[in-house]
From Swiss-Prot:
Keywords: Disulfide bond, Hydrolase, Protease, Secreted, Serine protease, Signal. It is found in: Secreted. It comes from Corynebacterium glutamicum (strain ATCC 13032 / DSM 20300 / JCM 1318 / BCRC 11384 / CCUG 27702 / LMG 3730 / NBRC 12168 / NCIMB 10025 / NRRL B-2784 / 534). GO terms for cellular component: extracellular region. The keyword Hydrolase applies. This is Putative peptidase Cgl1093. Residues 33-236 form the Peptidase S1 domain. GO terms for molecular function: serine-type endopeptidase activity. SMART domains: Tryp_SPc (SM00020). Disulfide bonds join C59-C75. It comes from the Bacteria.
Length: 278
């Protein structure tokens, strides 16, 4: 695998997913948490979040070793990433990026830093994620969209493991989760799905519909447990054997996604919508 640059391809495409008020939904590069809350929890999860600077835009990533972060492959543009700010605050440490290694098929990328970060790192979730499990999404999209100086988080419940999601890459195997207490908007691409303080998924896509109130209420995550060997090979990270087996794979075209009803706006400090590519 080389560190050659990757030309970003828009993942936006109309998808026949199920929603009470929006039968046509786009699965687009997933995006900032709006109407959410500041990242909380252990210092491990809050310190490990990374804001990746990509020209005039940004993505989110997660530190998994002192020198390696993981993010979405579609976040890596032609020419690469300029730098990374590590931690949940804009006062976090900043480093230039040495290289980015792209997964050959999945929407994953590994970003190497030249120096060890002083932040904590996270372990991969030790089991294959199952429907019904609850976790937290975290991201830096609010920094660009709303001027938030602290990374934001929302709650996610995994609904199913899917393939054939209406998008350019119908072969992608993804964890589909509904988002509550916040919504995904541009800038959270590549961000973590934490379960029990460990990294279970990397954000790849989110809903993008005509009714803005439904945007970002469903996210699709790359299941990192299914790519543990690739991650360990390039980063040198020790990864314990993954427990259990992957959940049943559901065809998302034959069995369309259910989009939950829009949540009421709470008037939090990051209200409003900023929709577009990451």
């Amino acid at each position: 695998m080389s560190s050659a640059s990757f030309t970003t391809k828009a993942l936006s495409v109309l998808a026949a997913l199920t929603a009470a008020s929006a039968p046509l939904v786009a699965a687009s590069p997933a995006h900032a948490l709006a109407n959410a809350r500041n990242v909380t929890g252990s210092s491990t999860t809050s310190d490990s979040i990374v804001r990746l600077h990509i020209g005039n835009t940004a993505c989110t990533g997660t530190m998994i070793t002192p020198t390696w972060a993981i993010t979405a492959r579609h976040c890596i543009p032609e020419g690469g990433i300029a730098g990374a700010a590590i931690g949940s605050s804009t006062l976090s440490q900043f480093q230039q990026v040495s290289q980015a290694i792209l997964h050959p098929t999945a929407d994953l990328a590994l970003v190497e830093l030249p120096n060890q970060a002083s932040s904590n790192t996270v372990d991969l979730y030790g089991a294959h994620v199952q429907p019904g499990e609850n976790g937290q999404a975290a991201g830096w999209g609010g920094y660009s969209a709303f001027g938030q100086n602290v990374a934001q988080q929302a709650d996610v419940q995994i609904q199913r493991r899917v393939v054939n999601v209406p998008s350019p890459d119908r072969t992608a195997v993804l964890l589909e989760g509904t988002v509550s207490n916040g919504r995904l908007v541009p800038g959270d691409s590549g961000g973590p799905l934490y379960i029990n303080g460990q990294l279970a998924g990397v954000l790849s896509m989110s809903t993008d519909v005509e009714n803005d109130a439904l945007d970002g209420t469903v996210g699709w995550y790359i299941p990192v447990a299914e790519h543990a060997e690739w991650i360990a090979y390039y980063t040198g990270k020790h990864i314990a054997p993954i427990a259990g087996a992957p959940a049943e794979l559901v065809d998302a075209t034959a069995n369309p996604t259910f989009i939950p009803a829009p949540q009421p706006f709470t008037g939090s400090s990051i209200g409003g919508w900023a929709l577009g590519s990451s």
